[in-house]
Amino acid sequence: MEKLTYQFLKDTGAKVPIVGGPMYPGSNPELVAAVSNSGGFGVVQPLALTALYGHDFREGLQLIKKLTKNPFGVNFTIFGGANKKYHKQMERWMKISIEEGVKFFLTSLGKPNEIVKVAKQHQIKVYHDVPNKKVALAMKDCGVDGLNCINWRGGGQTGIQSAEKFIEELHDIGIPLICAGGISNKEDYKKALEMGYAGVQMGTRFLATHECKVTQSYKQAIIESSEEDIVWTNKIAGNNSSVIKTKDVMQGGLRTGPVINFMLRQSKLKRYARMYLMSQGLKNYNKTAFDDSVQFWQAGKGVGNIKSCLLYTSPSPRD
């Protein structure tokens, strides 16, 4: 076992180096627990847990703890403090996570300085989503323990470069790198580890499981789609997000209008535009998760290797 893979397993408490990516929708307690029970490492998304699945945050964490005796993590989307109400809520969620014994935070979309500072006081590991080398180096300077390298094959908020490019640029960074994007079977998993990644993050593969509480039509769309069916839109969070090409998606358009486009190009306005888009997206996600007639489905380019809906009881990718 490579040194940094061992470090990742030590950081998470997982038995195999597979992260169940935090998803909205898809971050229901049953799925998070199933990933951890199988030897991987489930990560819960607080907004999905509360706003989508209707759990009080503390009670949701306690439910996951009842469903698995193995460790799991919590994801915090930062947004750079654009929304003070949300920022206060995130601080409350972090406090509750600490009280409930969570020992791993996965952060994204913003600078995690404050979270890292608090986490280190409680011996909590922090990994951060990164899209490129520049951000990766900045996050290491912030003191994060590992990097979740979001490549261009990922579902949801996707990256801008290949998994190979990340390794080429960051192979000597000295902290664990997780390959996030396009991992859907054991061949993808093995290839990522052979490239030099400490582990992988899987999202789309876990949506098409019996434990995931999204509609059957969503799961079936993943099973029936190919890599060519995945398109990018910036209407979810301001940056590119991968979705399955459907009539609903194309009718709504893939790109934001001129006002939001302008805001996204301004450093002082960008975070507010992203926050607005995310708030609008949350309304659509609620329909996506529970209404079979709504065809707005996030998924990555690994869909082509997903051929069935699984009961996730194996500690490594199948199919």
Label each PLM-derived region with a short phrase.
Residues 1-176:
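Active-site entrance/lid segments in N-terminal catalytic domains of soluble metabolic enzymes
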Residues 35, 192, 203:
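Conserved, mostly hydrophobic/aromatic
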Residues 134-142, 166, 184-198:
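Catalytic cores of alpha/beta
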Residues 147, 200-203:
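Hydrophobic alpha-helical packing residues
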Residues 178-183, 202, 311:
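Glycine-rich beta-strand-to-loop/alpha-helix junction loops that act as flexible
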Residues 213-278:
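Amphipathic alpha-helical blocks and their helix-capping loop/short-beta junctions
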Residues 276-300:
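Short glycine/proline-rich, acidic loop/turn segments that cap or connect secondary-structure elements
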Residues 312-319:
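Conserved small/polar residues in nucleotide/adenosyl-binding loops
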